[in-house]
Amino acid sequence: MATRFRQTRRRRGHVSMGYGRIGKHRKQRGGRGNAGGQHHRKTWFTTFHPDYFGKHGMRVFHLKANKYYCPSINVDSLWSLVGKDVQEQYKNAKTGEEVPVIDCVKHGYFKVLGKGFLPKQPVIVRARYFSEKAQQKIKAVGGACELTA
């Protein structure tokens, strides 16, 4: 809408001419933007943005999880995963009958090693890896080795 007078004519009599009373139409004496956050605007920053400054820890983006993580268990410790009552329950089981299943991965072990001896009792062992001796000893008592992912 066209007006008859310019703004300067219309604002005569108003002290600040529309530019406010604090800066009075001068440049940024407090700095631009977030300047002075630790100096003359410290109270404002500590009140409304308390964690703006300082260290906040880090994300270790270059560190990979251990790809060689492979906890192992020996053949002589396999029965300790299931307990004595299970061993007694399947004591007289033959190769064709129902035999206990020992899931090593469920108990936190990925690899079965061949140290020690197994009781002469068939058993199915599930793991991600088996050493050759462990496979031989498990099969010698009539058991089986199952690879899991």
From Swiss-Prot:
Single GO term (MF): structural constituent of ribosome
Q: Which domain of life is it from?
A: Eukaryota
Q: Which GO terms describe its biological process?
A: translation
Keyword annotations for this protein, in alphabetical order, are: Cytoplasm, Endoplasmic reticulum, Ribonucleoprotein, Ribosomal protein
A Pfam family recorded for this sequence: Ribosomal_L27A
Q: Where is this region: Disordered?
A: 21-40
Q: Which SUPFAM superfamilies does this one have?
A: Ribosomal proteins L15p and L18e
Is Ribosomal protein among the key words of this record? yes
Q: Which GO terms describe its cellular component?
A: cytosolic large ribosomal subunit; endoplasmic reticulum
The record's subcellular locations are: Cytoplasm, Cytosol; Cytoplasm; Endoplasmic reticulum
Does the record carry Cytoplasm as a key word?
yes
Q: Which InterPro entries match?
A: Ribosomal_uL15, Ribosomal_uL15/eL18, Ribosomal_uL15/eL18_sf, Ribosomal_uL15_CS
| PANTHER family with a match to the protein in the record | 60S RIBOSOMAL PROTEIN L27A (PTHR11721), LARGE RIBOSOMAL SUBUNIT PROTEIN UL15 (PTHR11721:SF3)
Q: Which family does it belong to?
A: Belongs to the universal ribosomal protein uL15 family.
What this chain does, per the entry, is described as:
Component of the large ribosomal subunit. The ribosome is a large ribonucleoprotein complex responsible for the synthesis of proteins in the cell.
- Subunit structure, interactors included: Component of the large ribosomal subunit.
Q: Which named protein is this?
A: Large ribosomal subunit protein uL15C
Q: What is the lineage of its organism?
A: Eukaryota, Amoebozoa, Evosea, Archamoebae, Mastigamoebida
The gene is rpl27a-3
